[in-house]
Every structure is written in structure tokens, then in C-alpha cells.
Amino acid sequence: MAGEITMELDNYVEQVQAIRQNCLKLTTVVEKCDQILATLDAYQQRKLPKCELTELELSTDLIFDNLIGYPQLMDVSAQFENLRQVMIENFGIWHICNQLWIDDLQTFCGPNSCNLEIMAGNAVISANLKNTIATDNLDWQGQDNERPCPWTAMEKLDAVTAVRKYYSHVDNIIMAWAPDSGDVDWQVLQFLRQNHFQGNLIVIGERNGATNSAKFWQNARLQLIDQLNQHHRPFDFINDQVWLVK
């Protein structure tokens, strides 16, 4: 059933803690456990983790070199990679960011910039980026998470309406993890082109993958932003990156 929690937070934390305890001699596994636990602890407090997640999948060499002593390693990567679903179901957060990345984003946008976040979800980015208007029509409610709980004040607007209202007043528009159904993202990009938007459209998503519409990726002029990808690295099977889009 949509919105039903299948990945209980407490159960997942216990699983990761058990993996850590059983693999104390495997430094790589312990480090990954610590990253996951620190991320969950921070988000429970409505704070951002201080450091980014690194790739959670265990290497084939590590698994097979230690398989006799640690047969459970065959299942550990899958358990680690459940993190995003845990975040979605328990926090309503699809895009997992960290404080280092937010600092990079703030530097890129500028200390005095005015910003708009569309399809903001629970507005984690807006809550941590200065002078940012958070907007979302909350039509994702019930899709793995029943209860929107924004981190900051949010104006209930769909993406196109929000862009029409604010594009001439902001320097940066941020769109993170837009859904791959519909073509609202493409409508937004068309509107900005037609109205000669002079600011930056910053998109966080997986090209031709889990986020955004096919039409958007087919028509977007994309530039990877090194500054915004140094502390934003794919950690699971979804290769999301930060793009400047024209």
C-alpha cells in the first residue's frame, strides 16, 4: 500500500549496528556502518550530516577475501543500499545531502543570492541555503511517505506556477530529484528558455535514469559542475549528479 512503511527506522539502525559489531576487524565495513548511522542520526535531529556518504556497495575483492570468516558479507551491500528507501519512507527525503555539499552550493550561488527551490519535497535544501523560497504542491504525498513534514516554511505551488511567479526575482532555481513521470521538468525548462532566464537552473538527478523525464534529458543542455559534485557522490545504485542546465 502506498505510504506504508516497510523499512522501519529503528529496525534498520539495529541491522546496521549488528553488522558493525560482527565485522569489527573489517575497517571498510565499520566505516560504511558509521557513515550510515551518522546520516540517520543527523536527519533524525533535522540536521545535515557533516560528511558525504561514500559508495556503500562492498567490493567483490573484499567480500571474497573474507567470505569464510564473514559469510554474511554476501548480503551486506543490499542492506546498506536500503538506506535511501529508509530515508524516503521515514523522512520523506529522496535526495540525501550533507553539510559540505550545502556549503559548496552556498558558495556557488553566492552569499547574497536569491534562490527558488521547486518540487522541494520536505525542503531540506531550502532550510539550509540562505534566502531560498521553498515550493512544492505535495503531490508526492502517499508515494512511500504519507506525511509531508517540511524543514522550513513552504509555499504550496506546483513547479511551473512557482517558476512563473518567481523566475524574475531569483538568481538560482534548484530542482532536486524531480520525478521520472510526467514532463513538468521539461515545461519548466521551456518556460525559462522562452523568458530568457539569466540565472542558474541547478538540477540534481540521474541522467536518463531514476529522476526527471526522458524529454527533459533529451532536450537539456547539460554542464556538470565540479564544485557541486566534489561532496556529492553517488553512494548506491543511483548515479545522481549535479548539473547546470540551459
Language-model regions: role of each:
Residues N122-T132:
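Conserved SAM-binding loop of SAM-dependent methyltransferases across substrates and taxa
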Residues T135-H169:
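S-adenosyl-L-methionine
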Residues G182-K246:
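C-terminal substrate-binding/active-site "lid" region of AdoMet-derived donor-dependent transferases
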Residues F91-P111:
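A short, well-structured juxtamembrane/interface segment
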